[in-house]
Amino acid sequence: MDEQRDTTDRFLPRFDAAGLVTAIVVDADTQALLMVAHMNADAIEATRATGQAHFWSRSRSALWRKGETSGNGLTLVEMRVDCDQDALLLRVKPAGPACHTGRRSCFYRRVEADGGLTFLADDAQG
């Protein structure tokens, strides 16, 4: 079946040993990278059923809906799967900052050649 994942028209996610796939989340309007998370079968089903992004928390071992406590939910515009069906791309409309720090994106620091971090001005806390 693995060799057919790149040619089939069926959604057949290839979960890792922990039952997860990587989910890359981008703003559907700006294409800005917002966050990377993990989804299990329940998170995928909940996202498809509700139109709101759900993920699996590895630290809490629990299903969670983005924005559940903050109100900064992610409305699904489109879900794509990569050629191996082991990673997902979620194009979303964010209702606020995607990062728990209050920033638009979780990727707000650049790693410099010397190993230092530079905070990016275009992703200031809001």
Curated annotation (Swiss-Prot):
**Superkingdom to which the source organism belongs:** Bacteria
The answer to whether UniProt assigns keyword Hydrolase to this entry is yes
Q: Does the keyword Zinc apply?
A: yes
EC number(s) recorded for this UniProt protein? 3.5.4.19
Q: Tell me the Pfam families matching this sequence.
A: PRA-CH
What is catalysed by this protein? 1-(5-phospho-beta-D-ribosyl)-5'-AMP + H2O = 1-(5-phospho-beta-D-ribosyl)-5-[(5-phospho-beta-D-ribosylamino)methylideneamino]imidazole-4-carboxamide
Report the cofactors. Answer: Mg(2+); Zn(2+)
Q: A single GO BP annotation from the record?
A: L-histidine biosynthetic process
Primary residence: cytoplasm
Question: Where does the chain bind Zn(2+)?
Answer: 83, 99, 106
Keywords in UniProt for this one? Amino-acid biosynthesis, Cytoplasm, Histidine biosynthesis, Hydrolase, Magnesium, Metal-binding, Zinc
Q: In which pathway does it act?
A: Amino-acid biosynthesis; L-histidine biosynthesis; L-histidine from 5-phospho-alpha-D-ribose 1-diphosphate: step 3/9
| GO MF annotations in UniProt | magnesium ion binding; phosphoribosyl-AMP cyclohydrolase activity; zinc ion binding
Spell out the subcellular localization from the entry.
Cytoplasm
Q: Which NCBIfam families match?
A: PRK00051.1
Q: What does the subunit comment say?
A: Homodimer.
* Role, per record: Catalyzes the hydrolysis of the adenine ring of phosphoribosyl-AMP.
Q: What is this protein called?
A: Phosphoribosyl-AMP cyclohydrolase
Q: Which gene encodes it?
A: hisI
